[in-house]
UniProtKB/Swiss-Prot annotation:
Record-annotated membrane-spanning stretches: 7-27, 31-51, 65-85, 92-112, 191-211
Keywords from the named record: Membrane, Transmembrane, Transmembrane helix
Source organism per UniProt: Acanthamoeba polyphaga mimivirus (APMV)
Lineage: Viruses, Varidnaviria, Bamfordvirae, Nucleocytoviricota, Megaviricetes
Biased composition annotated in UniProt, kind: Low complexity: 306-318
Oxidoreductase in keyword set: no
Localization: Membrane
Protein name per UniProt: Uncharacterized protein L248
Annotated Polar residues bias: 262-291, 319-330
Region listing for Disordered, in residue ranges: 259-331
Length: 406
């Protein structure tokens, strides 16, 4: 409290008084301004406390006077700072200045649009712009060369540091009273509560929004909780089959018997031909480990089953022949079921067919072949005359080929 007597000679108080004198006497501003009233009240209270310091020995009276001085000092500094900031912004964003720029830009764009049709008339504004640009650049370069900025930066920095130091000293002297300490403690408590709110609510929300996580931020930071990936990913393709059609690659690892058990009816003469053909394929053959031999072998079995089905369906079916057809169908169904099991076992494998190949024409061709019964006709022709099927000039094969493309 002894330093209150020295505040009248403080440089910051003298500077504030000089600023008020220049503002209210030279610029003739209204004396009834709140800022001027605060400064006058502060000076009167400070002088009264300095003169009557020895007589005001009571603690309550001195404590109240220091609190009043503290409040007035804070309000004066806040008003001056706000005034400086507002004056700077008004100078930069002055309405008339902005209006002049807008009008000049509109007029210039109008002139350029009118002169757009004639390229020769555009030379004048372009030359003017180049001239102004060059002159402004020369003035700026000259200004920078002739003025040494380092001393200006040094003295400006020293001046503002000195102001901050004096403000801090005055504030520390005037804050040594009971009411100011209570207010400062409450303000610090509010600030701490705001910080806790920011750390507990806003920061976790920002972290979860940034990383796309909905879990507790503490568990995420401590690596306790697992990352919750988005659940909208469509993984249903893993449950589907890789291929819907039958491929010969699936026949490589397929274990099938060497012969098809096809019961034959003695009353059906066409079945006798199929028996002979079946006997031709049932001759013992040395097993080969190559894929091509296994493909040919299984392909012959499929064609034989198709040929037997077509021959049985073309004649009048007796009870015995009906049983034969059912057995053939059972063999074909068994073979297809085995193929399906192989494909299901390969569900996770990648397709071997190139993805960029257009299979629409091949699919339509195969559909026409199935609808027209071309596969059964080829199998029937092969069963009757196997040597004629390999002939390209066979008229029956040409006719079947034309029917496939319809």
């Amino acid at each position: 409290m002894d330093n209150i007597q020295n505040l009248c000679t403080n440089p910051l108080i003298i500077l504030i008084g000089t600023y008020m004198s220049i503002k209210y006497y030279l610029f003739q501003i209204d004396y009834f301004n709140i800022q001027f009233g605060l400064y006058v009240t502060f000076i009167i209270s400070l002088l009264y406390g300095s003169v009557r310091f020895n007589s005001l020995q009571q603690k309550k009276l001195m404590d109240g006077l220091i609190f009043i001085l503290h409040v007035l000092f804070v309000l004066i500094c806040f008003s001056i700072k706000s005034e400086i900031i507002s004056g700077t912004l008004n100078t930069i964003f002055y309405f008339g200045f902005v209006k002049t720029i807008i009008i000049s830009v509109v007029i210039g764009s109008f002139i350029l649009s009118e002169l757009d049709n004639n390229n020769h008339n555009r030379i004048i504004p372009e030359k003017m712009c180049c001239f102004c640009k060059q002159n402004i650049k020369k003035i700026m370069v000259t200004f920078v060369k002739n003025i040494d900025i380092d001393p200006i930066i040094y003295w400006s920095k020293t001046f503002f540091v000195k102001l901050y130091t004096e403000f801090k000293n005055i504030n520390s002297v005037l804050s040594k009273n009971t009411r100011s300490e209570i207010i400062i403690d409450r303000i610090c408590l509010k600030i701490s509560l705001i910080k806790m709110y920011l750390y507990s609510v806003i920061v976790p929300y920002a972290i979860s929004s940034f990383f796309g996580m909905n879990n507790d931020y503490k568990n995420i930071i401590n690596n306790i909780d697992k990352i919750d990936y988005p659940g909208n990913l469509d993984m249903s393709f893993l449950e589907q089959e890789v291929f819907d059609s039958e491929h010969l690659d699936d026949l490589d690892d397929l274990d099938t018997p060497d012969t098809l058990n096809v019961p034959i009816s003695t009353n059906n003469t066409d079945n006798l031909n199929s028996v002979k053909t079946n006997q031709q394929f049932n001759t013992p053959v040395a097993k080969s480990n190559t894929k091509s031999n296994r493909r040919k072998k299984t392909g012959k079995k499929i064609r034989l089953a198709n040929q037997t089905t077509s021959s049985n369906s073309s004649n009048n079916q007796s009870p015995e022949s009906t049983g034969t057809n059912n057995n053939v169908v059972d063999n074909k169904t068994l073979l297809r079921n085995k193929l399906r099991e192989k494909r299901l076992a390969r569900t996770g494998s990648l397709p071997t067919v190139p993805q960029n190949v257009d299979m629409s024409m091949i699919n339509s061709l195969m559909q026409n072949m199935i609808n027209n019964g071309s596969l059964e006709k080829i199998a029937t022709e092969f069963a009757k005359n196997p040597e004629n099927v390999a002939d390209i000039n066979n008229p029956k094969l040409r006719k079947l080929a034309k029917s496939m493309t319809k």
